[in-house]
Amino acid sequence: MARMVTYNARSAKPHPETAHLSGIDVLALMRDQELEQIVALNDPATGLSGFVVIHDTTRGPAIGGCRLWSYPTADAALEDAIRLAVAMTRKCALAGLNAGGGKGVLIDHAGIKDRAGMLRAMGRYVESFGGRFYTSGDLGLSGADIARMRETSRYVAVPDDRKLDLAGATAWGVLGGMRATLAAAGLGRSLQGRRVVVQGLGAMGARVAALLAKEGATVIAADTDAAVAGRVASSTGARLVAADDVWDQAADLFCPCATSGVLTSETAARLRVRGVVGAANNQLDAPEVDAELMRRGVLYAPDYAVNSGAITLTAREFLERRSDLRDIAALGERVEETVTRILETSARTGNPPQQVADRLADDALVRPRSTERQFWPLR
């Protein structure tokens, strides 16, 4: 049993055993980001450590993936969870879903004693929200991992479920975003003969590369895992380049499908493309990168407008009990319409696309917030 730490609450000096936890003023952060809830997770028996962040439930229960990642600090994990939860709220609002944004983040560390047990423990945490938070897979977690979580929670969507082709739904949305971006650049809607650089060939990047090849596009791709890259190249005919060389490829589109924050001032300056459209979350390292891309004549399709396919399917299955889940190509058409609207508004107003998308999403939240706030789950 852990030893109880005692502390004089009137003292202004942090307790020496907990001083390292005081890097973030959590309540100030919650007020600044308008967060509803932050839950810290700890299961000593399995080594589970992480956070669930719920940003906003005025439109409905929070939905967001769960990721397992090697963060340098707990602060970094919490900051990532917050950014992703806020983006999920906007993604749901922009897609017209009766849902809000949340995120689960697990810290990958040497102290994980039982991976399967850790995932079942995470499922129990999700279950404890009682339908306030729905989740599925994200970076670092496989379909089998999410199935483990599903064993202990009704509120977990398994991406490999035959009814829920989550990767396919998102991939079709990415292609829809690409068509809209090509058209906005004056290149027409067709992907036939277009050159597309795909960064990251995990489950999502591989699916996008396969669809692009089927559409007749030339795929240039990279992944830090040589074996994974080789398999995708063999099945799609993609030309492989070194991971750091993706920024220097002359192409029509750049498609980030790996980790967050890949678009920095430095990488944006190296791009030789007409547009950026990808499946990765939180692609911009900083808000000003959006404006830098615009100044360079590179169209940016905001990530949460593009990668909403999986969340749309999840919301339909869990919240609306819809059975029409097979026409995932139609989700691509919806994304194409949304991205077209964003890029046309950006061209007309001179505002960067990310700012336009944020405004459209926030406007969709104004009406619910103007009435009495609803705190899910309703009783």
PLM regions with names:
Residues 129-131, 192, 213-218, 268-275, ...:
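Short, surface-exposed connector motifs at secondary-structure boundaries
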Residues 78-85, 116-127, 147, 171-179, ...:
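Predominant activation on well-ordered alpha-helical scaffold segments within soluble catalytic domains
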Residues 182, 274-379:
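Adenosine-phosphate binding glycine-rich loop
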Residues 165-255:
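Glycine-rich phosphate/diphosphate-binding loop of Rossmann-like nucleotide-binding domains
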